[in-house]
Amino acid sequence: MIDVNNFEYMKIGLASPDKIRSWSYGEVKKPETINYRTLKPEKDGLFCERIFGPQKDWECHCGKYKRVRYKGVVCDRCGVEVTRAKVRRERMGHIELAAPVSHIWYFKGIPSRMGLVLDMSPRALEEVIYFASYVVTESGDTPLDKKQLLSEKEYRAYRDRYGSTFQAAMGAEAIKKLLQDIDLDKEVDFLKEELKTAQGQRRTRAIKRLEVLEAFRNSGNEPSWMILDVLPVIPPELRPMVQLDGGRFATSDLNDLYRRVINRNNRLKRLLDLGAPSIIVQNEKRMLQEAVDALIDNGRRGRPVTGPGNRPLKSLSHMLKGKQGRFRQNLLGKRVDYSGRSVIVVGPNLKMYQCGLPKEMALELFKPFVMKELVEKGLAHNIKSAKRKIERVQPEVWDVLESVIKEHPVLLNRAPTLHRLGIQAFEPTLVEGRAIRLHPLVCTAYNADFDGDQMAVHVPLSSEAQAEARLLMLAAQNILNPKDGKPVVTPSQDMVLGNYYLTLEREGAIGEGMVFKDANEALLAYQNGYVHLHTRVAVAASAVNNVTFTEEQKNMLLLTTVGKLIFNEILPESFPYINEPTNSNLEKETPAKYFVEKGANIKEIIASREEVAPFSKKILGNIIAEVFKRFKITETSRMLDRMKNLGFKYSTKAGITVGVSDILVLGEKDEILHEAQAKVDNVIKQFRRGLITEEERYDRVISIWSNAKDVIQGKLMKSLNKRNPIFMMSDSGARGNASNFTQLAGMRGLMANPSGRIIELPIKSSFREGLTVLEYFISTHGARKGLADTALKTADSGYLTRRLVDVAQDVIVREDDCGTDRGLLIGAIKEGNEVIESLYDRLVGRFARKTVKHPETGEVLVAENQLITEDIAHIVENSGVETVNIRSAFTCNTRHGVCKKCYGRNLATGTDVEVGEAVGIIAAQSIGEPGTQLTMRTFHTGGVAGDDITQGLPRIQEIFEARNPKGQAVISEIDGVIAAINDVKDRQEVVVQGEVEARTYAIPYGARLKVIPGQKISHGKELTEGSIDPKELLKVTDITAVQEYLLREVQKVYRMQGVEIGDKHVEVMVRQMLRKVRVSDAGETDVLPGTLLDIHQFTDANAKVLLQGKQPATARPVLLGITKASLETDSFLSAASFQETTRVLTDAAIKGKRDELLGLKENVIIGKLVPAGTGMNRYRKVDLVKTTQDDMNVENDEVYVEQ
């Protein structure tokens, strides 16, 4: 038996008239829909039961046969087959057209496919199809040319002169005749000959024609099928008609469009039967053509057909297009059952892997499970009574629910789901009330807060789904962020504040210098008020019992505070005792200075020492990362829960809060402002005397006020008390920063106006003093712009993510090693002298391509193909090695994906990447998710021309779309020396002297030079400041240079904003942009010149001819923007569901494309499991095998084996 859900590929093509008739179950002859009295479908109408099947299950139209027992009987009275009503979703009908009609997609699309096949202009085609001109179909022995257009007048004149020796016609029939006459093989050979000599426009046109003709020749589609003789009618359930309350009917627009076609078709038939004058018939044929056009794609040509209220009707094409179309609304975004949503509230007492589910919601979600359990426990006799029990919410239901829920994880999702941490699994616990309880530590990953956010719950049903949820998606498993491999579950806000307060030290606190035998005694003293949390005390080191203490240290006393003793209890046993916030203390051991001999004068020693800084958010993050590195997941999540509990407990005990008295206004503020004002007055004087320009005046005023604000900020921070609650909040990283504080107590500073230009009147007051009316008005500008920007940015960033996902969705780890011999040479990324990304950051988690040796000793630091761990990376960086050759996605040879070695470590787990990991989507999410944090504005540095560098989100879009950048830099095309810089008129020219030739470059007005005479320069390097156009760079250099440039630019933008992203994510995206080549010369292969091919397809075609000793093709690499690259993908399903649906489908149909279903989207669309992760073939072919007792050394009944 054929399995409908298991197929290997999907093919699309043109349908021949016979094919359309074979799909059909009958001809629709009347435009009627349903009878207004009986509300039953009219016979032969658009909803006819005889054609499309019965409206009610197992019941014919006239009611003679009812019930299942007549299954398959065709009623002898009404002719309706007795079957299920759902066949009305799949049975098609057809309309026999009285005159052929052109299909608007193939005639009107760009480029016009019909025009290319016939070598006629779209304008000429339009005149013929819509009956404005005649076209000569057979020239006979007249001086007329075939395909020549004739007006009505000319046609009559020629008819009179030549009689019937030539033939000319109008309408789609004429075009059909021309299409049937075409000899594809002859045309193709002719064009190939022409290509050898043609240049310019003729060559381009020939290439386009050749592509379309080859497509027809290879796909088995007939060109004449672009003209319709028969029109398919889609099943009635897909264009339903429903009765509204009030007796009126609502119907799909398609029914109106079909009715117009049928009406005009019937009228045309009648006119032809009557033998009406040709002008009337022609008019009717034109109207039929327009009706069919409107049905297929309303609005593509002329004015769209409108319904009531002047609303354009939705045609078949509109059903597919856009966010609400079939692809994105129903195929890629399905609604699921077993789901619910509710408001979230915090659940501080939950474990890391738990969430609280409201009782009513849980009962509804797990209803079938509860029903089954009720029957099994004998609490209900059958399923029906079990259901009744649940609906009446009888008390025994709750106990059963508890037991059902116990081992059954649920998925929680918060929209917008920007990265894979937006859906995680939890074990539910039942809670009262109607709100979902969420663990506070997972808020960062979800970007959730409790101000009314809602979340959705989903229940994984099958045992495989539950296992995946538990093993891969449980919140306790997702500790690292896939974008940079840093922990994403760092404590925030109250938790940070509590731990900060707990680890504070205070000089002269109560009980300073007391000595305790162990932590418990210190705790007892604290509880009884003898010491404070912040008191510096000594404890016997042996009682702390830390593995990292030496034998000698164990006999000494450890200097610490009561708070730190409490804090260290949450850490794993073999972890160093953390006494100061330094990396050496975290990674190695407690510094020796904290140990003193027994019998020493503790008080004196303590009094002579500085206070040690408390642990801020950053340190807590480092502790978590270090614990994760050493102890993996379970221990980390346990420690996180303890850290959370401590934080909440001690932030409550601390009672830290903000009062007006905590904000002290700086005394020296007035002096600073007076000074600044004097400077500004001076600048204005200079401007009035004409010594400086308006631009300079503006720049100087802005910089004077900015400096004044910085001075005030600096002094404020110095004058602050370390115990000031606001300072503690900002210093610990819980909330707020220096700038907030400056605005509260110093001055608000400069504000931007809505266009982004800075207003030169500063706000001199702080919030504590209160703003004047004018100052308040100015500050509303800035605030409003901030909100508007954020809203725009979110949409922009979401669209960027969508494009990124689309271009990389089929990049999956496919194999262990691709065996490439190429690598990528990397060093630190620098901008000037500032290191943007260090060599260490770039090395960790990658495989070395070549052996790395110590530059001085020559000792081998990393062997070839060895994984570079954190420790090795430190060693390499400290050894003074500048560049390392590593395996990279750029140079990976794997088709449709990457291999394990080239990708390196999976950042989300800290282990090797698994085969099947969908690294393309992870890369897209990692780049897209921080998009919202990037600034929106294009910086205008003082408004000097040529200095407009785009930054932030617009720059990222510019890079990934491979657009010409703003403020483009001029680059050198040759290696050489800057021979001279000449002034020509009001511009400059740079002369580069190479070994063979000299090149002169005109520098655009206002651009700033980056070079000086005598300087050496290599090809592809900038002569002026600004961004390089990557397409230009590709012409001058090679792929590697472009890859490195794009990677560097992306990292620059993100790192400047303080966002870290792993290189490998950018590499995956850039690789997708550079995977195509454009054929320049076809050689003796069968590829066409000028076409875009995948690099692998190109090498295959060449390998084939080289084996036969023929001439291979040549090609140039092409850089495509991500949108273009998505549309150029081999999968038409993926491209059609992305953008430009009609164009993609038109093209695919003519070429008779096969979609091999390699990517994720294609498989989601057709409803198969995605071929990534556990859905990969190699993991699907796993069987359960029962073994005999003899072979069993394990207790399990089954073992998994791979076929």
UniProtKB/Swiss-Prot annotation:
It holds the Pfam family RNA_pol_Rpb1_1. Its cofactor is Mg(2+); Zn(2+). GO terms for cellular component: DNA-directed RNA polymerase complex. Mg(2+) binds at residues 449, 451, 453. It catalyses: RNA(n) + a ribonucleoside 5'-triphosphate = RNA(n+1) + diphosphate. Its EC number is 2.7.7.6. GO terms for molecular function: DNA binding; DNA-directed RNA polymerase activity; magnesium ion binding; zinc ion binding. GO terms for biological process: DNA-templated transcription. Zn(2+) 2 binds at residues 818, 892, 899, 902. It comes from the Bacteria. Binds 1 Mg(2+) ion per subunit. The keyword Signal does not apply. Zn(2+) 1 binds at residues 60, 62, 75, 78. Keywords: DNA-directed RNA polymerase, Magnesium, Metal-binding, Nucleotidyltransferase, Transcription, Transferase, Zinc. The RNAP catalytic core consists of 2 alpha, 1 beta, 1 beta' and 1 omega subunit. When a sigma factor is associated with the core the holoenzyme is formed, which can initiate transcription. Belongs to the RNA polymerase beta' chain family. DNA-dependent RNA polymerase catalyzes the transcription of DNA into RNA using the four ribonucleoside triphosphates as substrates. This is DNA-directed RNA polymerase subunit beta'. The gene is rpoC.
